[in-house]
Amino acid sequence: MKIALTEWRDNMKLIRRGTFETNSSSTHSITMCNKSDFDKWKNGELYYCQDNGNFYNEEGREKVIKKNIIREKAKYDNGNYIYKNVIVPYKEIDKLCTEENLSEITKEEIETYLEDCDYYEIPLTYEEWDDQFEYEKYEVSYTTNSGETVVAFGYYGTDY
């Protein structure tokens, strides 16, 4: 890994100091987490959501999906969202995701949503995440001076 990073650094051209620049035909992703969460994810005990970088258990995953369904169902009108006759400013759409509204989302609605959703927005198993992205993937672990092991993972490649 150090050889590849050295080659990469040596071939970089400085355009603006302190800014990482890339051409628009490539894509990059990096996520850092503790090793125990990463291992639980790889073992199917947790789900990872690319959208917010959080890990979830099964219950948390279902809640994220239900919130996404409510956000999708809410009607946008002139800077506000309306759902079940409740109006909230667009920045406060999560106020529509009450426990009552979440509990009304059916299994059928969840299944329909999952058929057409953007996988970036829902928590995925490691296998689902790995299958979803057609880029090169990586995972690297590092142990800090205090003994904590951190894992960096993600994907990269051209977006042709």
Language-model features and meaning:
Residues 41-60:
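Charged, amphipathic alpha-helical linkers/stalks
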Residues 58-160:
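Low-complexity intrinsically disordered segments
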